[in-house]
Amino acid sequence: PHMLAVASLRDEQETDSSQRLWVHGKGEDTKMADNSVDVVSLAFVIHECPETATDALMKEAFRILRPGGTFIMTDNNPQSAVIQKLPPALFTLMKSTEPHSNEYYTINVVNMLKANGFEHAHQEQTDPRHRTVLASKPL
């Protein structure tokens, strides 16, 4: 909630922030209207979730996106050479603070988006350790 307060304060200082809405709540149940937003953006969220929650987040994103709207997520890239080559002790230490990372590293996010009705789902490597996954809601 503190970051939302910072975002709201910064919005007050801008001339045109009327289109932004900062919300603290469950991503799986936003209470937003169907077809009401143009973009759903998740940054470093999915690796924190069990697979069932990831699927629920995608279903909710699809529901609230307007036709033609964009889903975008940035997170760790399980296929990244950097992550693949981590020493076992360091990888174990990293996973010890991330209880759902085993699930995250085995799910196919692109296929999950397609299964939830999204089209044009694809991923791009953002940097040596991270990826961005994009998809759109059909028109």
Label each PLM-derived region with a short phrase.
Residues V133-L139:
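C-terminal lobe and adjacent flexible extensions of AdoMet/dcAdoMet transferase-like proteins
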Residues D127-R131:
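Short acidic/glycine-enriched loop/turn segments that link adjacent beta-strands
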Residues P1-D29, A56:
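Class I SAM-dependent methyltransferase SAM/SAH-binding core
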Residues V23, S41, I72:
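Conserved Rossmann-like nucleotide-binding pocket used by diverse enzymes
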Residues I72-N116, H120-T126:
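C-terminal alpha-helical "lid/dimerization" subdomain adjacent to the S-adenosyl-L-methionine
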Residues E28-V40:
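A short acidic, Gly/Pro-enriched loop at the edge of an enzyme's catalytic core
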Residues D55-P67:
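A short glycine-rich, Lys/Arg-flanked "PGG" loop and its adjoining helix->strand segment in the class I
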Residues D38-T52:
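A short SAM/SAH-binding and catalytic strip from SAM-dependent methyltransferases
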